[in-house]
Amino acid sequence: MTKQTEYKRKPEWLKIKLNTNENYTGLKKMMRSKNLHTVCEEAKCPNIHECWAVRKTATFMILGAVCTRACRFCAVKTGLPTELDLQEPERVADSVVQMGLKHVVITAVARDDLKDGGAAVFAETVRAVRRKNPFTSIEVLPSDMGGVEENLKMLMDAKPDILNHNIETVRRLSDRVRARAKYDRSLEFLRRAKEMQPDIPTKSSIMVGLGETREDLIEAMDDLRANNVDILTLGQYLQPSKKHLPVLKYYPPAEFAELKEIALSKGFSHCEAGPLVRSSYHADEQVRSAKENTAEAK
């Protein structure tokens, strides 16, 4: 048995019960009727049934459903993106009202075809949601937008409640996992975001199971803390298709618990770690915890 086939069968802790109720079907119909996309669907998130059916939350994916990059872990379509939909910010804001969300996550495909990386539409979406939902906290999860400081500033000036940007993997594996994104550029993006808006919590996420070592993960944690990242999420990488990178290890829950303790000892204000944890998983609880810790620090 080869190393690649050794881990084909998912362990018991990754088997989930699909809970499809009227909340789930209702949200799906609403998204289609408003021509909106969610990363929950496009990235084949394993938590979609819990979030949609039980928690009634969703992560909106703006700027279209086609990404200009082809990261080897990601299920989102790659190709030539469609034209910008300038009405999308208002539709997202209306959907947040209709869903009654207390916390919303807004992410996007990478738009390297645009000079601003999609920052203008991203910022307008934040403002539109804020106008119509003044009591809803807003988390943004952008690409690095080409590493252009002006693009990041445009987004940060819209004053989201939390800035999330994922390094996805450890330094040693970064070029293989996401060739068109750079590890150090992502760290710089996170550092600049904190410098621009010191009171806005920053967050990043790492997938495990791609061949990283414990030492690699500790190095990544140290890199994030050195750039003042507040929140860390750690989750199991799951291969979307045979075309994507294989899973080399399934981490048991106990190992995630150990990694969480290490992360908290490094100074992260909050760490969500577990086999099915994704960047937006329990995002409302993460931002609340970060703000409480920030208030205590003051």
Curated annotation (Swiss-Prot):
It is an enzyme of class 2 (transferase). The keyword Cytoplasm applies. Belongs to the radical SAM superfamily. Lipoyl synthase family. It is found in: Cytoplasm. Residues 53-269 form the Radical SAM core domain. Pathway: Protein modification; protein lipoylation via endogenous pathway; protein N(6)-(lipoyl)lysine from octanoyl-[acyl-carrier-protein]. [4Fe-4S] cluster 1 binds at residues 40, 45, 51, 280. This is Lipoyl synthase. It catalyses: [[Fe-S] cluster scaffold protein carrying a second [4Fe-4S](2+) cluster] + N(6)-octanoyl-L-lysyl-[protein] + 2 oxidized [2Fe-2S]-[ferredoxin] + 2 S-adenosyl-L-methionine + 4 H(+) = [[Fe-S] cluster scaffold protein] + N(6)-[(R)-dihydrolipoyl]-L-lysyl-[protein] + 4 Fe(3+) + 2 hydrogen sulfide + 2 5'-deoxyadenosine + 2 L-methionine + 2 reduced [2Fe-2S]-[ferredoxin]. GO terms for molecular function: 4 iron, 4 sulfur cluster binding; lipoate synthase activity; metal ion binding. Binds 2 [4Fe-4S] clusters per subunit. One cluster is coordinated with 3 cysteines and an exchangeable S-adenosyl-L-methionine. GO terms for cellular component: cytoplasm. NCBIfam families: lipA, PRK05481.1, PRK12928.1. [4Fe-4S] cluster 2 binds at residues 67, 71, 74.
